[in-house]
């Protein structure tokens, strides 16, 4: 039987080959505070509600 490599300590996406980087740490992440994330999502929800009220459905 063939041996399987154990991917200990790796992200599942990296282990599955879905992300191909030489190192997992190369991915850049957007740093956003929890308050900012809530504010942005609330603003998007409010904008969608306003658009829905102003524009009649087709």
Curated annotation (Swiss-Prot):
Tell me yes or no: is Transport among this UniProt entry's keywords.
yes
Query: Key word Phosphoprotein present in the record?
Result: no
Q: Which domain of life is it from?
A: Archaea
Please, one GO biological process term?
protein transport
Q: Where in the cell is it found?
A: Cell membrane
> InterPro entries under this entry?
Preprot_translocase_SecG (IPR023531), SecG/Sec61-beta/Sbh (IPR016482)
Entry membrane topology = Single-pass membrane protein
Cleavable signal peptide: none
Where do the coiled-coil regions begin and end? none
Bilayer-crossing regions: 34-55
Q: Which GO terms describe its cellular component?
A: plasma membrane
Entry's family note: Belongs to the SEC61-beta family.
The entry's function note states: Involved in protein export. The function of the beta subunit is unknown, but it may be involved in stabilization of the trimeric complex.
Which NCBIfam families does the entry mention?
PRK01253.1
Its subunit composition reads: Component of the protein translocase complex. Heterotrimer consisting of alpha (SecY), beta (SecG) and gamma (SecE) subunits. Can form oligomers of the heterotrimer.
**What name does the UniProt record give this protein?**
Preprotein translocase subunit SecG
Q: Which organism is it from?
A: Pyrobaculum arsenaticum (strain DSM 13514 / JCM 11321 / PZ6)
User: What phylogenetic lineage does the species belong to?
Assistant: Archaea, Thermoproteota, Thermoprotei, Thermoproteales, Thermoproteaceae
């Amino acid at each position: 039987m063939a041996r399987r490599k154990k991917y200990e300590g790796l992200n599942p996406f990296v282990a599955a080959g879905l992300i191909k980087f030489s190192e997992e740490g190369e991915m850049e992440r957007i740093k956003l505070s929890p308050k900012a994330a809530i504010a942005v999502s609330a603003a998007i929800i409010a904008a969608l509600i306003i658009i829905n009220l102003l524009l009649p459905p087709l």
